[in-house]
C-alpha cells in the first residue's frame, strides 16, 4: 500500500503505472516494474483502476467467487495483487479512488458495461481527479498506461488510457482540483506495446509445440490474436532478464486468472524457458530521449531531468 516519505525528500526518479485490473501490471509491465523497483533511487507506484470482479476464474475450487455466484472475486484478487507486488518488489500500490470505487466493466458489449458502478461508466472529471491527486503527491516524471484501444479493446483498458491522458494534462492545470495539491507537469507518458516481431515469434513457438491445442476455440493466429504495433513504432525497449523470474512468480500469484501450462501464459513468457523479460513501449507524450545509439530508448527516464 502507499509508502510515505518520512523525511519529505522525494526519490530522484518517480514512475506511476496505471493498470485496469489486478494481473495487468504483471502481464504488461512486470519485468519493467521489478527492474525499477530494485533501484533505491526510483519510486514505483502502481495504480489499479478496478478489483477485476468480472474476471474469469480458471481454478475450479475458486469458481464460487465469480460475479454470477458469490461475487467475491474482487476481494480475492486484492490478495493476489498484494502477492504479485511482493514478488515484483513494489511496495506502493493503490486502487484508483480507493478499493472498489469503480467496478470491473467486463468485456466489450457485455451486460456488465451497463452497471453504473463500472469503470466504463466513470465520470471523467471524478476519475481524472482521483489520479491527479496521486500524480500531484508522487510528482512522477513518467506515467505508463495502455494505448487508445486498450491493447485489446477491453473497456476498462480503454478507460484507463483515457483517464491517464486526461490526468496528464489536468495535473498541470492550476484550475483543475485546486485542493488536490500543487500542480505537476509529468515529462513523459508511455503506452504499453506488443511489437509485431514479438507476437510473431510467440505465435510460431506455440504452433510448433503441444501448446497449440490449448489455443482458445475461435482464435486464428496471428490475424485474430493479440493486437500489436509495427516494430518501427516502438520507442522504448526494456530488457530486464534479471527480473524474468520475478515476473513469472508474480504471474503465478494471480492464480485465479491464469494457468502455467496454458496458451496465454506461454504467449507472455515463452513457456518459462526461452523468452527474455523484454517489454516494449510507445511514447505518447513528451520527447524521446537519445537512446542507446540505435534510436530506441532503453530507459523510460531517458532524457528526463531527475529531481
UniProtKB/Swiss-Prot annotation:
Cysteine disulfide links: none
Pfam families registered for this protein in UniProt: PIG-L
Biological processes annotated in GO: mycothiol biosynthetic process
Residues holding Zn(2+): 21, 24, 157
GO molecular function: N-acetylglucosaminylinositol deacetylase activity; zinc ion binding
EC number: 3.5.1.103
Keywords, ordered alphabetically: Hydrolase, Metal-binding, Zinc
Taxonomic source organism: Frankia casuarinae (strain DSM 45818 / CECT 9043 / HFP020203 / CcI3)
Enzyme class: hydrolase
Residue runs in coiled coils: none
Catalytic activity of the protein: 1D-myo-inositol 2-acetamido-2-deoxy-alpha-D-glucopyranoside + H2O = 1D-myo-inositol 2-amino-2-deoxy-alpha-D-glucopyranoside + acetate
Necessary cofactors: Zn(2+)
Cofactor binding, per record: Binds 1 zinc ion per subunit.
Job of this protein: Catalyzes the deacetylation of 1D-myo-inositol 2-acetamido-2-deoxy-alpha-D-glucopyranoside (GlcNAc-Ins) in the mycothiol biosynthesis pathway.
Membership in a protein family: Belongs to the MshB deacetylase family.
Official protein name in the record: 1D-myo-inositol 2-acetamido-2-deoxy-alpha-D-glucopyranoside deacetylase 1
PANTHER family xrefs: 1D-MYO-INOSITOL 2-ACETAMIDO-2-DEOXY-ALPHA-D-GLUCOPYRANOSIDE DEACETYLASE, N-ACETYLGLUCOSAMINYL-PHOSPHATIDYLINOSITOL DE-N-ACETYLASE-RELATED
Amino acid at each position: 500500500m502507499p509508502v510515505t516519505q518520512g523525511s519529505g525528500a522525494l526519490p530522484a526518479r518517480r514512475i506511476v503505472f496505471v493498470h485496469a485490473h489486478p494481473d495487468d501490471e504483471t502481464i504488461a509491465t512486470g519485468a519493467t516494474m521489478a527492474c525499477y523497483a530494485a533501484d533505491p533511487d526510483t519510486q514505483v507506484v502502481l495504480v489499479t483502476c478496478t478489483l477485476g470482479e468480472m474476471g474469469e476464474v480458471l481454478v475450479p475450487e475458486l469458481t464460487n467467487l465469480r460475479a454470477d455466484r458469490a461475487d467475491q472475486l474482487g476481494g480475492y484478487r486484492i490478495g493476489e495483487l498484494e502477492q504479485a507486488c511482493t514478488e515484483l518488489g513494489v511496495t506502493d500500490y493503490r486502487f484508483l479512488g480507493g478499493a472498489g470505487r469503480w467496478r470491473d466493466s467486463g468485456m466489450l458489449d457485455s451486460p456488465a458495461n451497463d452497471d453504473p458502478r463500472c469503470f466504463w461508466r466513470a465520470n471523467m472529471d471524478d476519475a481524472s481527479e482521483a489520479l491527479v491527486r496521486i500524480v500531484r503527491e508522487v510528482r512522477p516524471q513518467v506515467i505508463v498506461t495502455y494505448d487508445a484501444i486498450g491493447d485489446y479493446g477491453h473497456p476498462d483498458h480503454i478507460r484507463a488510457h483515457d483517464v491517464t491522458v486526461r490526468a496528464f494534462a489536468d495535473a498541470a492545470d492550476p484550475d483543475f482540483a485546486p485542493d488536490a495539491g500543487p500542480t505537476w507537469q509529468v515529462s513523459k507518458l508511455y503506452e504499453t506495446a506488443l511489437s509485431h516481431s514479438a507476437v510473431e515469434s510467440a505465435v510460431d513457438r506455440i504452433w510448433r509445440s503441444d501448446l497449440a491445442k490449448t489455443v482458445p476455440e475461435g482464435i486464428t493466429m496471428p490475424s485474430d490474436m493479440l493486437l500489436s504495433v509495427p516494430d518501427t513504432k516502438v520507442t522504448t525497449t526494456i530488457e530486464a532478464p534479471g527480473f524474468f523470474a520475478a515476473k513469472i512468480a508474480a504471474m503465478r500469484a494471480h492464480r485465479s486468472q491464469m494457468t502455467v501450462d496454458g496458451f496465454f501464459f506461454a504467449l507472455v513468457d515463452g513457456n518459462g524457458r526461452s523468452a527474455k523479460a523484454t517489454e516494449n513501449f510507445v511514447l505518447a507524450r513528451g520527447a524521446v530521449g537519445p537512446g542507446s545509439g540505435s534510436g530506441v530508448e532503453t530507459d523510460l527516464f531517458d532524457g528526463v531531468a531527475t529531481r
